[in-house]
A protein has these predicted regions:
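Generic detection of intrinsically disordered/low-complexity segments and helix-coil linkers/edges
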Residues: 22-25, 88, 189, 207
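Aromatic-lined carbohydrate-binding surfaces of glycoside hydrolases
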Residues: 63, 68, 84, 94-102, ...
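Generic marker of residues within folded, mature protein domains
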Residues: 71-73, 88, 104
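A cross-taxa feature marking solvent-exposed loop/turn segments within ectodomains of secreted
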Residues: 1, 89-91, 105-107
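Extracellular Ig-like/FN3 beta-sandwich strand-entry sites
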Residues: 76, 91-95
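Surface-exposed binding patches on compact interaction domains or structured appendages
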Residues: 1-81
Length: 285
């Protein structure tokens, strides 16, 4: 199949009530390479010999941005279907079709049925469940091959983060330091705050990226809390721009050290002042 794509019909019940095709979304399931999970029963991560673990393809990401794709012969291509029932929907059983096409040529009609109950959920922003799924804007930039923090980057993130907001997400994941988890992920987390040591030895901080990120996440409906990482990164190594040498430098220091207390004392004083000015101090952790 050279141009696999899909669409929905309206869904109707026997009384003539309908659910618009706009209530339905779908995405192609993509595959990634992985290895055996928890083979040794220890339930831990860390270094291990790759030859001891078998590799395999697993269905993982749901690509909601891809509108069509080619599918080789004798392979399976799943499609994930999601239905967002509007609060105004009349209870009942609705029937409709998922149309599978190759370009403009119809391949298959899949009959679907959904039962709408009389119970009604509030809007996701009103849900009490404290959902905290970490976000990685860096992975999105790499996946869609767009410059980090560009308008194209934010445009690519918006539908993804809106899906997260619609799931009831409450927390914004923000990073204050370079590689807080020592870059163990495919796309390491960088700092959203620029740390600068001036030529006179004092500290200055630029929150431009942090502010843009938080404001963007709030614009999609995720605004209850900001979790900031990390005062104690795995490597206890902190990156900063050194004005005296016009270069990026690293300092290794730990809680209790004079250097640690000096730099973090300056940072927290500056950061708390900035958060209060933005009105975010009480929701930041």
């Amino acid at each position: 199949v050279k141009d696999l794509n899909f669409s929905f019909t309206d869904f109707k019940d026997k009384k003539g009530n309908s659910l618009s095709d706009e209530a339905f979304k779908a995405g192609f399931i993509r595959y990634v390479m992985t290895d055996e999970l928890n083979k040794d029963g220890r339930g831990a991560c860390g270094h291990r010999q790759a030859v001891d673990y078998d590799s395999l393809l697993v269905a993982d990401p749901i690509d909601t941005n891809l509108k069509s794709m080619s599918v080789p012969a004798r392979t399976v291509q799943p499609i994930w279907v999601q239905c967002w029932i509007p609060q105004s929907a009349t209870p009942g059983t609705y029937q409709g079709e998922l149309l599978i096409n190759d370009g403009s040529r119809l391949l298959q009609r899949l009959n679907l049925e959904i039962t709408v109950s009389s119970r009604e959920l509030p809007q996701p922003s009103e849900w009490a469940y404290h959902l905290d799924l970490w976000q990685s804007p860096y992975a999105v930039a790499r996946y869609y091959q767009v410059p980090l923090w560009s308008q194209e980057h934010f445009d690519a993130m918006r539908p993804l983060m809106k899906m997260l907001a619609d799931a009831g997400q409450k927390i914004i994941t923000a990073t204050l330091t370079h590689k807080p988890w020592n870059g163990q992920t495919e796309d390491y987390f960088d700092t959203m705050v620029t740390w600068m040591k001036r030529a006179d030895g004092t500290w200055a901080f630029d929150y431009t990226i942090f502010d843009r990120w938080v404001e963007f996440m709030m614009s999609v409906g995720i605004d209850k809390q900001i979790n900031c990482y990390s005062m104690v990164p795995w490597e206890l190594s902190f990156q900063y721009y050194d004005q005296a040498t016009n270069s990026l430098q690293f300092v290794k220091t730990a809680p209790g050290d004079a250097a640690y207390e000096e730099m973090w004392g300056a940072m927290l004083a500056s950061f708390s002042k900035h958060l209060k000015e933005k009105g975010w101090f009480d929701i930041c952790a």
